[in-house]
Amino acid sequence: METLTAISRWLAKQHVVTWCVQHEGELWCANAFYLFDAQKVAFYVLTEEKTRHAQMSGPRAPVAGTVNGQPKTVARIRGIQFKGEIRKLEGEESDAARQAYLRRFPVARMLPAPVWEIRLDEIKFTDNTLGFGKKMHWLRSPIRSL
C-alpha cells in the first residue's frame, strides 16, 4: 500500500489534531477537531482569532504536530508526527472548507470561528500494527519553477 494512502486512511478515522506554533521564542500547542483533505494533504480546523495559538500564528506560520489514537497496548500504537504551515483561510476558499467541515461536524455550525488550513509538508507515520516500531515517511514534493 502506498504510504500516503495508508496515512490518509488512518487519518480519516481520527478526529483530533494537536499542533504547535512558535513566536518570538515562545511555544504553544492547541488541539482541535479536524477535517482531513487527502487531495491537498491538509487539515482544516476552526479556531478563534483571539486564542493564544492564533495570535502567535498571525495570517500564516510554520507548525509541527501530532495525531494519535489511545490504544491500550504498545502493539496497537499508531500515529503521525508532522510539520507544515498553518494559514487562515479567507473568502471562497474559507466558505468551501467550512461547508466540508460542517458536513463532518454539524455541531460546529454554532461556532463562528475562522477556518484555518494546516498544510502538511512532512509526515512520519508510526504503525505498530505492522510490526513494532514500523515507520512510514512522506514528504511533499517541491514545486519546480519553469
UniProtKB/Swiss-Prot annotation:
InterPro entries hit by this protein: Split_barrel_FMN-bd, UPF0306
Signal peptide limits: none
Similarity comment text for this entry: Belongs to the UPF0306 family.
Name by which UniProt lists this protein: UPF0306 protein CKO_04548
